[in-house]
UniProtKB/Swiss-Prot annotation:
This is Basic leucine zipper transcriptional factor ATF-like. Belongs to the bZIP family. Residues 1-60 are annotated as: Disordered. One of its GO terms (molecular function) is DNA-binding transcription factor activity. Residues 55-83 are annotated as: Leucine-zipper. AP-1 family transcription factor that controls the differentiation of lineage-specific cells in the immune system: specifically mediates the differentiation of T-helper 17 cells (Th17), follicular T-helper cells (TfH), CD8(+) dendritic cells and class-switch recombination (CSR) in B-cells. Residues 29-51 are annotated as: Basic motif. The keyword Translocase does not apply. The gene is batf. GO terms for cellular component: cytoplasm; nucleus. Residues 27-90 form the bZIP domain. It comes from Danio rerio (Zebrafish). Residues 1-23 have a biased composition (Polar residues). Gene3D superfamilies: 1.20.5.170.
Amino acid sequence: MAQGSDNNDTSYTKSPSPGNKQGSSDDMRKVMRREKNRIAAQKSRMRQTQKADSLHLESESLEKENAALRKEVKRLTEEAKYLSTVLSNHEPLCTGLSGASPELLYGAHHGAFHQHISVPHYPL
């Protein structure tokens, strides 16, 4: 890039003639406007960086929560399979109750063929 072609370079601005108060006032306004714009741009970049940092932290938190929920789904799926197996193994022992209502099948029954089965507790 050629030297002096930068629009923000103030060394190439025209200096007003000593008697021209209007030109001096315009230059001051231009300098003030540029300074305000520079500060506003800096604040905008800071807000953008803070927002990106915040979104990054939220993303990490959601990924951890997602992993915990997937772990819980896996545990509950394994528990459901286990309980299904326990039920399948227990149903043949309840031969006198075939065709009975669900309350009798799955309620507390104390028949001669009832087998007590301990259910494992999975850690969270």
